[in-house]
Amino acid sequence: MTEAIKRSKILAFYGVPQKSDSAVTYTFHRMKGFDSISTSKNPKEYSRQYVDEEFEQTDVVGYTPTVSFEFDRFAGDPVHDDIIAIFNGEKTGADATRPVIMVDMTGTTKSAIKRGFAIVAESEGEGTEMYTYSGSMRVKGDKVFGTATSLDDWQTCTFTETSE
């Protein structure tokens, strides 16, 4: 029988921006304290029925992925602090766009996919035990395939693009 892959073997890293006079760079911090990070592919379909056929045909013509998230707020976590700043500042456009890297930890070489997302604030403060935030990340560009490495036991990572 083949081995099942645990959810904890697919890690998410969020690009926290550092602004300088000349450019914005990102440090990719591990997304900790998240109760949920789930992707909906949201396929775009083209359906039609031809007059000479008794059935409808459907083709998938694109995708609009959305990543839903929820996290318990931890003080001093750079990912939480950045997302909370987007929520509280009701940021829009480029000010609310961040790169995210998904890293597959199951192999020797850590394959990774990097993509830009708009951070969409949805709710905060639910529950009585922990202060929580929830929202979604909506796609802002193509997938970039590569590998990830880390020098600090996967608290942060570095992404290297590979040619497909």
Indicate residue ranges for each PLM-predicted region.
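Solvent-exposed edge beta-strands and adjacent loop segments
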Residues: 1-74, 119-131
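Extracellular/virion structural assembly segments
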Residues: 4, 52-115, 144-153
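Protruding loop/beta-arch "assembly-hinge" segments enriched in small, turn-prone residues
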Residues: 138-164
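Short, low-complexity, polar/charged sequence segments that are solvent-exposed and flexible
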Residues: 86-92, 119-123, 137-138, 155-159
